[in-house]
Amino acid sequence: IVPFLGPLLGLLT
């Protein structure tokens, strides 16, 4: 699991 996915999902939602 990539670490940037966390903040990325937060920005997308």
From Swiss-Prot:
Tell me which GO cellular component terms the UniProt record holds: extracellular region
Disulfide linkage: none
Per UniProt, the keywords (alphabetical) are:
Amidation, Chemotaxis, G-protein coupled receptor impairing toxin, Mast cell degranulation, Secreted, Toxin
The organism sits in which domain of life?
Eukaryota
Q: In which tissues is it expressed?
A: Expressed by the venom gland.
Residues that the record marks as modified (Threonine amide) are 13
Q: Name one GO molecular function term.
A: toxin activity
The UniProt record lists the keyword Transmembrane: no
Q: Where's it found, cell-wise?
A: Secreted
Q: Write out the GO biological process terms.
A: chemotaxis
Q: Which residues form the signal peptide?
A: none
Query: What this chain does, per the record?
Result: Mast cell degranulating peptide. Induces the chemotaxis of neutrophils. Its mast cell degranulation activity may be related to the activation of G-protein coupled receptors in mast cells as well as interaction with other proteins located in cell endosomal membranes in the mast cells.
Family of the protein in this entry: Belongs to the MCD family. Protonectin subfamily.
Protein name as annotated: Chemotactic peptide
From which organism does this entry originate? Icaria sp. (Ropalidian wasp)
